[in-house]
A protein has these predicted regions:
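Short, well-ordered secondary-structure micro-motifs
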Residues: 85-87, 108-109, 135-139, 176-179, ...
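Gly/Ser-rich helix-loop-strand patches that form or flank binding pockets
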Residues: 30, 35-84, 181-228
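A structural preference for short, hydrophobic beta-strand core positions in alpha/beta folds
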Residues: 22-24, 75, 125, 166-168, ...
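Glycine/small-residue-rich hydrophobic helix-like segments
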Residues: 136-194, 198
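Small/aliphatic-rich secondary-structure junction motif
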Residues: 16, 91-138, 156-158, 163-167, ...
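Short, solvent-exposed amphipathic alpha-helices that sit
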Residues: 1-9, 32, 111, 143-151
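Charged docking surfaces used in two-component/phosphorelay signaling
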Residues: 24-32, 168-174
């Protein structure tokens, strides 16, 4: 089965002009992928809901790949909560980002703005006001709005032509961003692994944003951000300086050559992914 899956994936990559290396991972996939993330700028996970690789990689906040990876992670849903096949856009016109004052949230904001600018897309910045005593007070809401303006100002200066919409929403961050996934092409979030706006996004496999979003979620992990800001000897000074790890040194990874799937198989897969493709 693994060989067949890799064969199809390689054929699709070849069709798009992308050089692909095929690997088989054994053992605990989350641990292996964390080590593999040292070697890549981005990891993409297809999520088909309950069961399968994605559920083992996402896990809980304490064990998930997005919480501990060295590079950003994109989680792409295959079906919605009811098992219906998702149809994702091939173009990006609207980007949403969850924003708070943490360094993880600020990095997610920066990445989302660069992403939206590159695609000439709109950027919706969402700041959630937690349910707590006095949270509906006008002064509290005004404070959140002022804080959001401060965070957005550098983006407006860096991207003067970028259309930025600001939203202050009451209630849990998870609900606000899950809702945003219905009418945005991608949702960008930061992850520090626990607590705060970003920590709530992972949660358990039954409650987290990553399990209920109906569109791609781009996660900016804690280690990626910390590597970008620190000058300590124990942590590289930028994500680009995270030392890669040779495949031979990563237990549970084997590079395997595979034959390319037949053209009709590739066409059937691509048609299933995008029924409107020409």
């Amino acid at each position: 089965d693994a060989q067949e899956i890799l064969s199809k994936a390689k054929a699709i990559a070849d069709e798009q002009g992308v050089e692909a290396t095929t690997l088989i991972v054994t053992g605990d996939p989350a641990s292996v992928f964390v080590e593999l993330s040292r070697n890549y700028n981005l990891i993409v996970i297809g999520n088909r809901g309950k069961g399968g690789l994605a559920e083992r990689l996402l896990g809980t906040t304490s064990s998930s790949l997005p919480a501990y990876a060295y590079c950003p992670i994109v989680v792409v849903p295959y079906t919605d909560d009811d098992g219906n096949l998702m149809h994702l856009n091939n173009t990006i016109t609207k980007v949403a980002v969850g924003s708070d004052e943490s360094k993880w949230g600020l990095k997610a904001l920066e990445i989302a703005a660069n992403f939206a600018a590159a695609w000439d897309a709109e950027l919706d910045v969402i700041s959630a006001v937690p349910n707590m005593k006095g949270s509906d007070d006008e002064g509290v809401m005004a404070s959140f709005k002022d804080d959001l303006e401060v965070r957005i100002k550098p983006l407006e200066e860096a991207h003067p032509d970028l259309k930025i919409n600001k939203q202050i929403v009451p209630g849990p961050a998870v609900g606000a961003l899950t809702k945003a996934s219905y009418d945005h092409d991608v949702v960008v979030v930061g992850s520090r692994g626990r607590g705060g706006f970003t920590g709530l996004l992972l949660g358990s496999t039954s409650q987290g944003l990553l399990q209920h979003a109906v569109g791609p979620v781009y996660v900016v992990p804690r280690k990626y951000v910390e590597a970008a800001e620190t000058r300590l000897d124990t942590v590289p000074s930028s994500p680009a300086e995270v030392k890669p790890k040779a495949l031979d040194d990563i237990k549970g990874v084997e590079e395997v050559p595979v034959s390319k799937a037949e053209p009709d198989v590739v066409e059937a897969i691509e048609t299933k992914i995008d029924p409107d493709r020409q």
